[in-house]
Amino acid sequence: MTTDYSNILKTIKPDGDEYRRVMELSDSLVECLNGLAEEQGIDAEAVLVGSVAKGTWLSGAADIDIFIHFPLTTPEDELKESGLRLGYGCIERFGGEAEERYASHPYVTGYIDGYEVDFVPCYRIDDASMLRSAVDRTILHTRYIQENLRDEQRDDVLLLKQFMKSTGTYGSEFRVGGFAGYLAELLVLRYGDFEGVLEGALQWRPGYIIDLEGHGTGKGFEDPLVVVDPVDRNRNVAAALTLQRMAEFVTASLNFLGNPSPEYFQPPSYSTDAAEITGTLSCRGSRVIVISTGVPDVPSDALYPQLRKTLDSVVKNLEAEGFSVLGADYWSDESKSTFMVLEMDVWELPSYLKRYGPPVWSRRHRERFLRKHERVWVEGSRLTIESPRRHRSAVSYLRDLLSKPDRLRMGKHIGVEIRRGFSVDLLDDVIGEAEKEFLEFMDAFLNPWKALER
């Protein structure tokens, strides 16, 4: 590295006290689980995995992942039941709160001593050929990083994760579509250090392949970036990365290398001033429409794909009606409210719409058209009329469209919420009552460059 990152690392790297607290709790939990398994005669072993096990977690963001692995001969129902029982038992012994979740199969999350701890049952495998479920790879991932990442490179991983986080490109969940932690670690292995990753990213193009172990399977994937999993030749670690986030990371890398400011390791400053946001909108000369509804009782991994599907359908219908959309996005507090926002280039249309009929030369069709319509003229060779629009404003059109949601391609649970109730408003009419988080989202929506340059 050519830049001094010591001051940045002081803010993002766990200090001695934090490291000790996290590791002591992790070790105690693993010991508790293994003790419970022995007491109950369960053939299973707990092991610490993830960023805590690899020493690559950002300060204040230690999510402890403990996998409970069972022999391959264990029936799946028994694995689920015994794994959950051990997780619940451990959480109870530590006086924590439990929440059951679901990935490829159920697991339990505990909130213990201020930390979020996942207890995940899986199968004990030695290589990917023995894979029974997607989570089984995680132990192999942890082992690979532990064996290949040099101690000094852990600082580079922290810098890369924080840079990605501050530029909005970190996180493989659907809502973000960015870089997973394991992917960031592999990039450091490939390029050597933090700056090496940024310089290497400038060479990326859609379909770019990174294959650390030379598996030779990269051409079989069609994702924007292909990083062949070192422990599973048939998996692309970057499969969740969208082209948008990939391009944003390349842009942020280019900006940083040209001006390596420490501000790139801090989140952008987004406005929470409603007047400032409406002022920005006024200068742009556009209008923002806000569609709001409730939050369905589904996990966030199910919520956001449904929002994306619904919003895409809304935009398609608006465009087909003649209302031009500059940009669209969605946001939810995941408890009470869900919002879809659309910045409109054209939000109001003339009272009449020009419609074209058959060519003048079409004897049968022209006569029927002329009988049906008055005030017909010719443009080119087509009979033409003016027809009154049903909806001149995009707001009016959307209220009508959403009141008959069968006309939209919507996510199932979002559709239920819209049928229960929704509102369609101009941003100017509702921004005064908006919460801080929504205002920050709106500023980011109107100023997407803020995440990528400082």
Swiss-Prot record:
Alphabetically list the UniProt keywords.
ATP-binding, Magnesium, Metal-binding, Nucleotide-binding, Nucleotidyltransferase, RNA repair, RNA-binding, Transferase, tRNA processing
Q: Quote the EC number.
A: 2.7.7.72
Keyword RNA-binding (UniProt): yes
Q: Carries keyword Transferase?
A: yes
Cystine bridges: none
Read off the InterPro entries from this record. Answer: CAA_C, CCA-adding_arc, CCA_tRNA_nucleotrans_2, NT_2-5OAS_ClassI-CCAase, NT_sf, NuclTrfase_I-like_C, Polymerase_NTP_transf_dom, tRNA_NucTransf2
HAMAP family reported in the protein's UniProt record: CCA_arch
For this entry, the protein name equals: CCA-adding enzyme
Taxonomic lineage: Archaea, Methanobacteriati, Methanobacteriota, Methanomada group, Methanobacteria
